[in-house]
Amino acid sequence: MNIFPAIDIIDGKCVRLTKGIADDKTIYQHSPLDMAKTYQDAGFNTIHVVDLDATLGKGNNNQVLSQIRRKIDINIEVAGGIRSKDAIIDKINEGFNTIVIGTFAIKNIDDVLNFDDSLIEKLSIALDIKNNQIASHGWQETTNQSLKHIIDKYNNRPIHSYFVTDVANDGMLSGLNMETFNSIKKLTDKHITIGGGVKDLNDIELSRSNGFNNVVVGKAIYENKISINSLVQFNA
């Protein structure tokens, strides 16, 4: 199992949202690049970076993302507002290792399924769960498509992974909703990254014992609920 520390960015600053609500955010003093360097120096092998401005359709932080990619040597999983094939290719060409797509993957399933293997192998399909439905467009909309329908489609292609977020718990420090995550795990043999609500090391232990591949941790680090050094010990 691996821990992916999260860096969420709005207006060039590190933030954490509560339940995916843009107006309910906490801004932190460290710059995204400083946090990325901290995680690299601590020994993590992957960081999860989200451009929330792009997610919400309010501009982007491309310069910040590019700076992080240039100065950080470890793997970077990038997410946020990546809603076209060209945008995916641009991120790959910049050197990002895994590209997380949600809205585009849900709204344009057939297009994504037809990508060449070399491209689709770089993709993590985001499944943002909100009120038992899949959310899109910065968690502002939900789709009537079932989780099973979407997962069945992508199970037939060599995607990198699924990225599952429990939006209701995200930023709440309320603990992982293992019932939701385990229900998805039953639908696929692909790698799964989970996140949303990690509050302590018990959540990490629970994730490992349930066989999840990666866990994203954000607010629990920023709020000093879990030490960086203790998290690194869980990396495979």
Region roles according to the model:
Residues 41, 48-94, 178-182:
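N-terminal active-site wall of soluble small-molecule enzyme domains
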Residues 28-40, 84-89, 142-153:
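Short, acidic/polar
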Residues 12, 18-23, 89, 96-170:
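Conserved anion-binding
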Residues 93-111, 168, 196-203, 210-230:
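Glycine-rich phosphate-binding active-site loops on the catalytic face of alpha/beta enzymes
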Residues 76-98, 179-214:
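Catalytic cores of alpha/beta
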